[in-house]
């Protein structure tokens, strides 16, 4: 009897960081930037749609991640806004906020995010 073969495909998502996200990550987390980024990636690899949709931002989601330097858990940590494009398995990390500095995106940031989201979805065919 021939040996059967079963193929399993594990869908990994690709992460794309915006320049504002990366700059803010390195400014806020400094030496812990890689640790924070990896924690975000692990959370989103497990459940890409985990964050709550932000009204008016074109399918952009907002989630929380702990600040390892503060030791206060997710509530006292960072907020990040991202766009998950399921058809392409892309997650665009758009903005990172420190709760102590800014809890929500400013109107100017929201305008930029709406523009990015529309452009990214259009480019992806979503």
Locations of regions flagged by a protein language model:
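Arg/Lys-rich, positively charged N-terminal/basic patches that mediate binding to nucleic acids
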Residues: 1-39
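Amphipathic alpha-helical interface surfaces
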Residues: 17, 36, 40, 74-77, ...
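Generic solvent-exposed, charged/amphipathic alpha-helical segments
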Residues: 26, 41-45, 114
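Compact soluble domain cores
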Residues: 32-52
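Basic/aromatic recognition patch in beta-strand/loop cores that engages polyanionic ligands
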Residues: 50-96, 101
């Amino acid at each position: 009897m021939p040996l059967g073969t079963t193929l399993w495909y594990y869908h990994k998502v690709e992460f794309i960081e915006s320049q504002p996200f990366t700059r803010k990550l390195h400014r806020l987390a400094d030496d812990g930037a890689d640790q924070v980024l990896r924690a975000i990636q692990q959370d989103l690899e497990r459940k890409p749609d985990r964050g709550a949709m932000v009204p008016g931002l074109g399918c952009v989601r907002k989630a929380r991640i702990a600040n390892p330097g503060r030791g206060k858990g997710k509530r006292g940590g960072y907020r990040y806004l991202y766009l998950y494009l399921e058809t392409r398995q892309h997650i665009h990390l758009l903005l990172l906020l420190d709760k102590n500095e800014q809890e929500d995106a400013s109107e100017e940031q929201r305008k930029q995010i709406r523009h990015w989201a529309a452009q990214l979805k259009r480019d992806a065919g979503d």
